[in-house]
Amino acid sequence: MMMALQIFIKILPIMFFGILLANLMCHLNILYKLQKYIKNKYFPIIAVFFVSSTSGSFLLKNLLKKGEISEENLLPIYFLGMFVFGIHIILFYAIPMATSLGWYVGGIYVLIKFLVTCNYLIISVLMLKKRKYNIDIEFKSKSEGLYGAIRDTFKQYFRVLTSFVPSVLIITYLIEHGLLDIVEDFAGSLLNALNLSPTILVIVLTGLATISGAIGIASGLLDENILSPNEVLFSLFLAGF
């Protein structure tokens, strides 16, 4: 279970503080205060999605229940939020990874991640323009204070854990008990023909559970010189699909 433990140590604290920050922004009315100075009708949702896609999804769900957005508006706003969260992933995961990959390989990785992320923005803009959505969301709700922020943080965090933790535990357990050897029997010859190490399957299989876990394992394998930068880059793209 050492592999799972390493993933949890790297990912779970980041996930928790991201959700906590998003809830603090909502419950302490930080978004409403900032909205007075930043005149953009999408800003509150963008701000929440930037720190946590989980909290952003919960926010949209609550706004839908309250009737502040319609079901027609939900999808383009969600795509807009996922574009912003994609920028978060690039800033806090892709770019730090790229520094260890080198300027050439790392630059290609970040560029492709950015271009893929831009698809969310393009889809959102086209839907908003074509259907002439008129979305104007402003946070005027009464603040629930620090208690409300902490309460919702743990509520959302444990919901994520119910899927994240079992997935990582199952995948890493199977890897540590021979799954990789079985997979290598089928794909090893092909990967060797491509001058790739079968070890990249560790990253790819982890990506089936969580791409964040795949990035964490990739950085560890790169630090220990088990995989080359090109192999890490290739495996991360496979894991992303």
Curated annotation (Swiss-Prot):
It comes from the Archaea. The chain crosses the membrane at residues 1-21, 43-63, 75-95, 108-128, 160-180, 200-220. It is found in: Cell membrane. Keywords: Cell membrane, Membrane, Transmembrane, Transmembrane helix. Signal peptide: none annotated. The keyword Membrane applies. It is a multi-pass membrane protein. GO terms for cellular component: plasma membrane. The keyword Ubl conjugation does not apply. To M.jannaschii MJ0871, MJ0880 and MJ1556. This is Uncharacterized protein MJ1589. The lineage of its organism: Archaea, Methanobacteriati, Methanobacteriota, Methanomada group, Methanococci.
